[in-house]
Amino acid sequence: MALLHTHFFSESLGMQCTMDVLLPQKLTRPALPVLWLLHGLSDDHSIWQRRTSIERYTDGLGMAVIMPNVHRSFYTDMHQGLPYERFIADELPDIARNLFHLSPAREDNFVAGLSM
């Protein structure tokens, strides 16, 4: 699998953001199924590579794994904070699908995470 450390600008957050992406070495379909893997409060997106075997678990499944960094946002739009729910639910999938061959089909998208 390929591990990409990706930096991009978020219009909804108004700042540079990061996500780590695992991709299969070979495309087996025109658009990959995707696991959106969300970190917990005390960590960031890198925790999945540092403390789990996510690459080993997903190798051979023919799917992408997207691990975004959302800081301590609780993945919500805060009254006095940034619109992280909009970022995660709307903007990030569009950005990731434009950068990588990811399937937009509901049955090809999976969400998992820790804490928060």
Where are these regions (language model features)?
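Non-catalytic cap/lid and distal C-terminal segments of serine-dependent acyl enzymes
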Residues: 1-116
